Amino acid sequence: MSWLHKFFDLFLGESEEDAERETKPAQIPQQQEVHHPEGQLKRLEDPKIYYEYPKGKFRFPVVPDGYKNHDLRRRRTPSDEPKSAPRPSAAPYRERPRNEEEQHTYQAAEPAKKPFKPTNIPSPVYGFNQKPSVKKDVPKKPSETLNEPDKSVKEKVTLLSEEIERERGYPASDTQAHSKIESPFFPDTQFEKQPSGVLNRKDTEHDEALAKRPAEPSGNKVPFESGVQQPEKEEPFFPAEQAEEQTPPEMLTDTAAEGLSDSEVGREEPATAEEEQREQQPEKFEEPVFSAELDEEQTAPESQTEAVSEDEKAKEPSDSPVYNHHENAAEGAESPFVQEEQMDIRQEEPLFTDHEYSSEALAQAETVAKESEEPSESIINNHYDTLGEAQETKIDVQPDSHTELEKTEHMEQGSKSSTATLENRQEIRADKPREASEEPKKRPGVQEKRTEQSASSQKGPSVPFNVMMLKRDTHKQQKAEERRGSYVFPNVALLDVPPAQVQDDTAWIEEQRQLLDLTLKNFNVRANVVHVTQGPSVTRFEVHPEPGVKVNKITNLSDDIKLSLSAKDIRIEAPIPGKNTIGIEVPNRTSKVVDLRQMIRSSAFRTSKSPLTAALGLDISGNPVVIDLKKMPHGLIAGATGSGKSVCINTILVSLLYKADPSEVKVLLIDPKMVELAPYNKIPHLVSPVITDAKAATAALKWVVEEMERRYELFAHSGVRDIDRFNQLTAEHQMGEKLPYLVVIIDELADLMMVAPNDVEESIARIAQKARACGIHLLVATQRPSVDVITGLIKANIPTRIAFSVSSQVDSRTIIDIAGAEKLLGKGDMLFLENGSGKPVRLQGNFVSDREIDRVVSHVRSQMPPTYLFEQEELVRQGSALKEEDELFYEACEFVVEQNSASTSSLQRRFRIGYNRAARLIDMMEAEGMISEAKGSKPREVLITASDLINE
C-alpha cells in the first residue's frame, strides 16, 4: 500500500508523512496507541491497568501475552489508516446532494433481525464468555468505501473496527476493558457488540443530558423528521448495486472538498467529545444487561462488520455539541440505521460551528468532567485520560482517513454482494424504528431515567458498603424499622372539633363578688374577695381574712353563703395551698364541656415523652392536667353511678392509644359489666380479649401476679432495679426482648369482690405493693366505695385516687380520706388526689363520645392484629384443674394399688384425713377409671397396676 502513501503525499506534503512515521512505531505494538497522544501512552502500555480497581483486591483473568501479535496481524491495515496530519474540514457533508446520501445511508449498519431484548446477564468480570468463530485474517472488502464522508468519522471507524476485531478474537475481559474506554466516544458503533440494553441506556443518558440543556434551537427538530421519512420512501427504488455504484463518486467528491474547513472541525470536535464524555461518564460503571441478540451479526465476515462500523461512524460529522447530543440521544436506542439519517439533516441544516459557542461548551464540559472525576479515583481517572487521548488523536490524525478513503475506493468491486446483504437487513430492521415518533420517545426516556435515579437513591442502603454490620446491630436496626413502620399513631382529626363556647360572665362574676362581700360583712367577718378565677365548671373566689379572723369563722358560714349566693352547692377550701387566702368555689351558671381533642393538642400532652401519659382534664384555672401512670403508679377511681367513672377510664385509654406503641404498652381490660370496655376488643395493645367473666378475671389477676414474679426474677438475674434500666441494657447488649409496660384496668371491682373476695383482694394487694418497679400498673374503678369493696389493704397500697360525686361524707372519706366529694357536681367533676399530694385538686374531666372512641379504635385495629399472651378460657381451665386436683391424689393412688383394694375408711386411717376428703379421693379415682364402682359393703376392685400408674 506504499503507493497510496506516495499518492497521498502529493496532497499532504512531507511534514505530514514525517508526523505519520513518528507515530507509527507506537501504533504497531499496541492497538490503542494509534489513537492517543504521546503524553499518555505509558498509561495504556499495560492492559492490566484497565482491571485495577482502587483497592487492588479484585481478581481478574490474566490476558495472554500473545494477543498483541495477533492484534498486529489482524489490524495492520486499520492501524495504517489514521495518520497525524492537519485535519481537513467536515464541510463536504453540507455540499452533498441529498438523494445520493439517502441512497447510501441504507447500505450498512445492519443490526440484528430480532427486536432488542436484554435476556442474558453478563458476569461483571468475564462478560459473555462466548467466542464466536470468526475469520480472523479476512482482508478488508471494498464495502468500507460505501459511506465514508469525513476524516474524523474515519478515525472513529478505525477505533471501533479494531475493538470489534479484538472482541471476536480475544478474551472477554480484554474486550470489556477497551469497551469501557471507547464506548463513551463511539456510541453508534457499539451496535456491533452490545445489545439493546446498552442502546437503551445510552438513549436515556442522552435524553437526560438533553433535557438539562437550557437552550437548543427548535429548528433542528423539524427537518429531522423530514430527513428521516424521505429516505424511507426513496430507498426501495434503488437496488444495492446501483447504490454502490453511486457511492464512490460521492465519496471522492467528499474527499476533494475535505480541505475546506479544517480549523472549523478542529474547534468543534473537542467540545463534542467533551460533552459526550460528560453525558456518558456517569453511567460508565452501570453497564446494562448484555444479550446475545446480535450473534448473527457478530459472526458475520470481518469485511462486512468493518463496512457496517464505518458506515455508522460516517453518520457522525463534527457538528455543534448541542446538535450532536440531540441526535445521539434521540436515536441511540433505536438502530444504527436511524442514526444514518441524521447525516442528511446535518447536510441541509445550518451547523452551529461558531467558535465562541464551541469554546464555551468545551470549557463547560471540562468543568463538569473535573467535578464528576472525584467520586471514584483510579478507574474514572483512567477513563477520563483515555477520553482525552481519543479527542486529541481524533483532531491530529483525521487527514489520514483521506488515505483510507482512496484505499477503499480501489477495493470497492469485491464487496458488492456483502454490502447488498447488509443493506437489505438494514432496511428490514430500520423500518419499525422510523415509524415511531422520535420526540415522544425522548421525554419518557428522561422521565424513566429520573425515576430510576430517584428510586435508587431512596432504596440505597442506610449503612455504608464498607461498614460490617454485626448480628446484634442488624437486629437493632430491624427492630427500629419495625417500630417505625408498624404502628401509626391516630390523628387528632379523628376526634370531634368542640363547638365554640363564647360566654361573657363578667357581669355575673362581679355580682357574685359583691354578694359575697356583703354576706361576710353581714356576719361580721372582716374579709373581702381579693381574686376571682373562673374554671370550666366552677368559679373560685379567693377571700383574704383580716388579721385576727379565724379560718373556721368563714368555713362555718358555708350554708349561709350558699343561701345568699343562691348556689347549688359550694365548697370551701381553707386555706388554698401556697396562698394566704381561702377559696370559695361556686358553680358556674353553665358548665363548659372539656373535649379530649383540646387535651390531646395541649403542649403538656404533646411534650410528654412517657408512653403512659394520660389526659385527665382541666383544673379550676383552665390549665390541662396530664398524668403519668409511671408516677401514679396505681389508681383508684370511685364515684356514684353517672358521675363519670367510665368516661374517665375511656379518656385514659384513648390517651394511651394516642401515646403508646403496642410494643411498648400492653393493656389488660377486666370489665364485669360487659359493655363499658367492649369497644376496645381486638386492638393490638391487648394481652388478651376483654375479660368479662368474674372467674376469668380472677385467673387473669393471678396471671398478672405470676408475670410480676417472672419479671422480678429477670431483674434479679440482670442486676437491675426497674424496667427502664432493664430495657436499656436489653437494647445495648441484645440480651433479650424488651419488656412492655402492662396496664391492668378493672372497671367494676365490687362485682369481683362479691365472686371471689379473698383471691381478688390478695392479687390486687400484691400487684399494688410491688408491681411498680416491673412496669405493671393498676387502675381500679368502682361505683360502691364502701369499706367492704375498698378495703384498707387495697386503699393503703393505691396512693393515687380520683373521687367523683358520691352520696355521703363517709364514702368521700373512704376514697380520699377527707370530705368534699359529696359536694361535687357530677358530670366529670372530680377531686384528684395525686401520689404525694396532701390535698386533692378539683378538676373537670374530659369527655369523649362513643363515635370518637370507635374512630380511634378502628384506626388502631387497622395498624396490626392483636397478639394475645394468653386466652381466658385456658386460664379458667387451669384454675379449675388446680382446684379439683388434690395434693394427696397420687399418693392415694399408690396406696390403693399397693393394697389392691380401695375404701374410704382405709384412706382415712392411712392419710389421717376426714371422711369428706377421703370420699372425694375415692370418687376421683373412680372417675379416672382406676377402681371399680361401689359394691355395697365390699371393697372396690383395683383396675390398674403399678406400671400403669407410673405410665400415667
UniProtKB/Swiss-Prot annotation:
Residues 237-250 have a biased composition (Low complexity). The keyword S-adenosyl-L-methionine does not apply. It holds the Pfam family FtsK_SpoIIIE. One of its GO terms (biological process) is chromosome segregation. The keyword DNA-binding applies. GO terms for cellular component: cytoplasm. Residues 414-423 have a biased composition (Polar residues). Residues 15-468 are annotated as: Disordered. It is found in: Cytoplasm. Disulfide bonds: none annotated. It comes from the Bacteria. ATP binds at residues 639-646. PROSITE patterns: FTSK. GO terms for molecular function: ATP binding; ATP hydrolysis activity; DNA binding; DNA translocase activity. Residues 33-49, 93-104, 134-169, 200-215, 278-287, 310-329, 343-358, 391-413, 424-452 have a biased composition (Basic and acidic residues). Its main location: cytoplasm. Gene3D superfamilies: 3.30.980.40, P-loop containing nucleotide triphosphate hydrolases (3.40.50.300), Winged helix-like DNA-binding domain superfamily/Winged helix DNA-binding domain (1.10.10.10). Homohexamer. StfA and SpoIIIE are not functionally redundant. They probably play distinct roles during growth and sporulation. This is DNA translocase SftA. It comes from Bacillus subtilis (strain 168).
